[in-house]
Curated annotation (Swiss-Prot):
This is Leucine--tRNA ligase. It catalyses: tRNA(Leu) + L-leucine + ATP = L-leucyl-tRNA(Leu) + AMP + diphosphate. ATP binds at K622. One of its GO terms (molecular function) is aminoacyl-tRNA deacylase activity. Its main location: cytoplasm. One of its GO terms (cellular component) is cytosol. It comes from the Bacteria. One of its GO terms (biological process) is leucyl-tRNA aminoacylation. The lineage of its organism: Bacteria, Pseudomonadati, Pseudomonadota, Gammaproteobacteria, Pasteurellales.
């Protein structure tokens, strides 16, 4: 081996070996335990960013470690290739989305290969390829035949900028999650998949995922939003109309003072027919923000409809109001309002001078003031006829029973979850495989017509969707009769909901999945991706797996056993203010810094000498120009150094702060490992290790080696605290660099230690370890080496160091045999010269011995 560590020479050579020998090709082998490790695939945006690098490094470390344990490891890769950014880039660059996408895939693939990830590239998937989405289209038609797909005109979240429908999950604080444009409500025909049919399974299944983060499971539970309540039907006075509400608090039923209905409720339209003021209010409410998150904070507005509902138990007439806090797509689109016991209803009632009627009082003697706020806790009933005095459960059941007997109510389990709207009005997506016949009937496209191929050679003008603009594209025939193809495309979450399963058989042409391959590899053993996907991708991912199970493709109930949500990558962000008062962000790579003695930034300047404002560590982003190009870092420091820093700088689930000084430190550490192996190689051990002939110092060093092996194995395998595993190896390296290499057994202990260090670092820094493994005299590549095992016997200590205290103050330390009893420890401790100074001529009151650690002598004159 050469004396200097040169990653620029080592890494290309090792990567070439891996590629030529298909080292990471996964083949089904029933004789071996499988391990499927998957990182969420990326959108091919053009260049890798450090968030990608972190995600895929974590996955690669886990995959390589599991392979060393002897498992048959699958780590595939692919591209979530449909989506809006391709259309925007195509318009901007005057190219086709397909061309832009495929160029990006090629470029990003080269970047990934530079980082040495052990992917099985033979299984590569791009979701925009017809051979992939053909089966998605086919599965959609099968779901339609099962009654799990339907089309309806509905009020949807519409982004006027992107001209597309957004799922509820894609509306953040009333704005589009992608472009931040205020979202409008619009009536549009949409295709839906009945995810609500699986709500109970999706909820219950969370209990079978002990290795998923609690936060993700909580977010999904809240998103599914199961509640038990009663659906109650009110007659509308002087009409034949009825209005249904759902409540989880039937105990408050006698306190209803008005009903609130959504602007899109049919009763609202009825009431507005001869009321222009109401019609204008309804239109305003329809166009308002629609995100559920806004409901708690937005101003409550309403208008009386002039209609009244009849309370089914009291006969009281209750005014019906259109209220902007009632949404048509949640529940029935109407609510019963109990101002005394619901804060939102209370605020609305106070604003519009509506009745506030108490029907619940605290169980304890607690003072409440219903002129100031609602009392929302459970309590006992008052002003509620025969139910007075009952607690929540008694009132719930009693009132529900009465309503059911009268035929105006029924117990019901409701979910906050809504069916999944999968239609998108964009071009760059998989065409929805449905046909409209001349008579207006809508039918699924037959299998022989699939895939319905999206034309890739198109011109984007930024105004019209090419397949909607081309009247000929939609024209087709079914059984010789004219028909029109659907021009909407699938939500891209469709593709990412089943890609993990297609990886098990990407070339399979006889069906959506090869059940034999799928059931060998699935479920995914380890899934890795950001927590921002908790209520979108990760919910659809679980839903699709249950659909695949019910279609007979897979036997497991859940798609992934274990989930790791990696933290974001942060970097310093710097800016100056332009003469027009605009913030101009400057890349951290161009900034010259001055720091104080604690390392804090006190001055930052750009190449022109301008003093910059340091806005702190923030998520790497284009908008703040603080992204660090992984490729530049690999070229400067080497892939192993970048990988090591990524795994060492922070626990995997926490945010990681990019510090180039830390990257430099990682490079220095690898240089030390290289140097130690080089020094050893100049005079290697010529005989094997003889553990019966070791000196005390050699035993101590060997004990440290095996304690480190045990810790690193647990940290990488069970705990997934990769940063502490690396810290343990660094600590061991400090001891190894000080160790003697004089005797043959010194060198034999060092040989064992270096073999262990190289194997422990291999999952994290595979290129350097590949080279060092050969330098240590191993004939086969480290890729086939077994994980190093800790020798339990080596970790047993012959001696213990006992701290000796006198009256709680340390007065000495003594070495005793590991199995020494208390009397022996006392004898040795009392003979210590320094201890004797403090106990001679003193009365020993008592002696406290903490076995193997501490002896405390309590004395008095």
């Amino acid at each position: 081996m050469q004396e200097q560590y040169r990653p620029d020479m080592i890494e290309p050579k090792v990567q070439q070996y891996w590629a030529e020998n298909k080292v990471f090709k996964a083949i089904k082998d029933e004789s071996k335990e499988k391990y499927y490790c998957l990182s969420m695939f990326p959108y091919p945006s053009g260049r890798l960013h450090m968030g990608h690098v972190r995600n895929y490094t974590i996955g690669d470390v886990i995959s390589r470690y599991q392979r060393m344990l002897g498992k048959n490891v699958l780590q595939p890769f692919g591209w979530d290739a449909f989506g809006l950014p391709a259309e925007g880039a195509a318009i901007k660059n005057k190219t086709a989305p397909a061309k832009w996408t495929y160029e990006n895939i090629a470029y990003m693939k080269k970047q990934l290969q530079l980082l040495g990830f052990g992917f099985d590239w033979d299984r590569e998937i791009a979701t925009c390829k017809p051979e992939y989405y053909k089966w998605e289209q086919w599965f959609f038609t099968e779901l339609y035949k099962k009654g799990l797909v339907y089309k309806k005109t509905s009020t949807v979240n519409w982004c006027p900028n992107d001209e597309t429908v957004l799922a509820n999950e894609q509306v953040h604080e009333g704005c589009c999650w992608r472009c931040d444009t205020p979202v409008e409500q619009k009536e549009i025909p949409q295709w839906f998949i009945k995810i609500t049919d699986y709500a109970e399974q999706l909820l219950g299944g969370l209990d079978a995922l002990p290795q998923w983060p609690d936060m993700v499971k909580t977010m999904q539970r809240n998103w599914i939003g199961r509640s038990e309540g009663v659906e109650i039907t009110f007659d509308v006075a002087n009409t034949n109309e009825k209005v249904a509400v759902y409540t989880t608090r039937p105990d408050t039923f006698y306190g209803v003072s008005y009903l609130g209905i959504a602007a899109a409720h049919p009763l609202a339209s009825l009431a507005a027919q001869n009321n222009s003021e109401l019609a204008a209010f309804i239109q305003e409410a329809k166009n308002a923000k629609v995100a559920e998150a806004d409901l708690a904070t937005m101003e409550k507005k309403g208008m009386a409809t002039g209609l009244f509902a009849i309370h089914p138990l009291t006969g009281e007439k209750l005014p019906i109001w259109v209220a902007n806090f009632v949404l048509m797509h949640y529940g029935t689109g109407a609510v019963m309002a109990v101002p005394a016991h619901d804060q939102r209803d209370f605020e609305f009632a106070q604003k519009y001078s509506l009745q506030i009627k108490q029907v619940i009082e605290p169980i304890a003697d607690e003072e409440i003031d219903l002129t100031k706020q609602a009392f929302v806790e459970h309590g006992k009933l008052v002003n509620s006829a025969e139910f007075d005095g009952k607690d929540f459960d008694g009132a719930f059941n009693g009132i529900a029973d009465k309503l059911e007997k009268l035929g105006v109510g029924k117990r019901q389990v409701n979910y906050r979850l809504r069916d999944w709207g999968v239609s998108r009005q964009r071009y760059w997506g998989a065409p929805i495989p449905m046909l409209t016949l001349e008579n207006g009937d809508v039918v699924p496209a037959p299998m022989e017509d699939l895939p319905i191929i999206l034309p890739e050679d198109v011109v984007m003008d930024g105004v019209k969707n090419p397949i909607k603009a081309d009247p000929n594209w939609a024209k087709t025939t079914l059984n010789g009769a004219p028909a029109l193809k659907e021009t909407d495309t699938f939500d891209t979450f469709m593709e990412s909901s089943w890609y993990y399963a297609r990886y098990t058989c990407p070339q399979y042409q006889n069906g959506m999945l090869d059940a034999e391959e799928a059931n060998y590899w699935l479920p995914v053993d380890q899934y890795i991706g950001g927590i921002e996907h908790a209520t979108m991708h990760l919910l659809y991912f679980r839903f699709f797996h249950k659909l695949l199970r019910d279609a007979g493709f897979v036997t497991s109930d859940e798609p992934a056993d274990k989930l790791l949500c990696q933290g974001m990558v942060l970097a310093d962000a710097f800016y100056y203010t332009s003469p027009t008062n605009e913030r101009i962000w400057v890349s951290p790579t161009l900034v010259t810094l001055e720091r104080d003695e604690k390392g804090r930034i006190i001055k930052a300047t750009d190449p022109e000498g301008r003093e910059l404002v340091h806005s702190g560590m923030t998520k790497m982003s284009k908008s703040k120009n603080n992204g660090i190009d992984p490729q530049e870092m690999v070229e400067k420091y080497g892939a192993d150094t970048v990988r090591l820093f990524m795994m060492f700088a922070s626990p995997a689930e926490m945010t990681l702060e990019w510090q180039e000084s830390g990257v430099e430190g990682a490079k220095r550490f690898l240089g030390r490992v290289w140097n130690l192996v080089y020094q050893y190689q100049q005079n290697p051990a010529k005989t094997s290790l003889d553990i019966t002939a070791l000196s005390a110092e050699q035993k101590v060093l060997r004990r440290e080696v095996h304690k480190t092996i045990a810790k690193v194995s647990d940290d990488i395998g069970r705990r997934q605290t990769f940063n502490t595993a690396i810290a343990a190896v660094m600590e061991l390296m400090n001891k190894l660099t000080k160790a003697s290499l004089d005797s043959e057994q010194d060198r034999a202990v060092m040989a064992e230690a270096l073999s262990a260090v190289v194997r422990m670092l291999y999952p994290i820094t595979p290129h350097i370890c590949f080279e060092l493994w050969q330098a240590l005299g191993n004939e086969s590549a480290i890729d086939t080496a077994e994980w190093v095992k800790a020798d339990e016997a080596a970790m047993v200590e012959d001696e213990k160091l006992i701290v000796v205290q006198v009256n709680g103050k340390v007065r000495g330390k003594v070495t005793v045999a590991a199995d020494a009893d208390e009397d022996t420890v006392k004898t040795i401790a009392f003979a210590d010269e320094n201890v004797k100074k403090f106990i001679d001529n003193q009365h020993i009151v008592k002696v406290i011995y903490v076995v193997g650690k501490l002896l405390n002598v309590v004395v008095k004159p």
